[in-house]
Amino acid sequence: MISVTDLRPGTKVKMDGGLWECVEYQHQKLGRGGAKVVAKFKNLETGATVERTFNSGEKLEDIYVETRELQYLYPEGEEMVFMDLETYEQFAVPRSRVVGAEFFKEGMTALGDMYEGQPIKVTPPTVVELKVVDTPPGVRGDTVSGGSKPATLETGAVVQVPLFVEPGEVIKVDTRTGEYVGRA
């Protein structure tokens, strides 16, 4: 059990029959009454968010989440199949639990948050290298400063890239924001 005053962003707890991660935390001291804790939680299974208010003495059930290295194998309908690199066990993970699912290519490694032997969240590396499959030609006179154009990557994701990027080039993409970082 964990006291609500010990909650911090990233803390994972079990409440209301589900697994939740604290994303925001605020401790409020009231004049004559006791202190309150207002926390925003994200459901690890559905992605839904909820804001809850607790009295400072309340407790929640904390959970142990293990982080393991997983390898992306292949897509299967609305799921993505990953393999644990230690045990070679395979898991079909719903796309809703995969952060930046559009940037995964076969053979790529990622970190999986595991609870009771099952992945609850899969996170890709911060920066991935992907090949540009299609992009319109960049015309220099179209912009006043900089300029960008859409580019379709080998995974099907579309990102904005500078005008000088051509089809066939390998670029680096930030998986948190989906932005172009540079050439590989």
UniProtKB/Swiss-Prot annotation:
Top-level lineage group: Bacteria
Keywords: Cytoplasm, Elongation factor, Protein biosynthesis
Pathway participation: Protein biosynthesis; polypeptide chain elongation
CC terms in the record's Gene Ontology section: cytoplasm
GO biological process: peptide biosynthetic process
GO molecular function: translation elongation factor activity
Protein's cellular compartments: Cytoplasm
Alphabetized Pfam families for the sequence: EFP, EFP_N, Elong-fact-P_C
Matching HAMAP family: EF_P
Similarity comment: Belongs to the elongation factor P family.
Alphabetized PANTHER family for the sequence: ELONGATION FACTOR P, ELONGATION FACTOR P (EF-P) FAMILY PROTEIN
Function: Involved in peptide bond synthesis. Stimulates efficient translation and peptide-bond synthesis on native or reconstituted 70S ribosomes in vitro. Probably functions indirectly by altering the affinity of the ribosome for aminoacyl-tRNA, thus increasing their reactivity as acceptors for peptidyl transferase.
Protein name (database record): Elongation factor P
Organism: Thermus thermophilus (strain ATCC 27634 / DSM 579 / HB8)
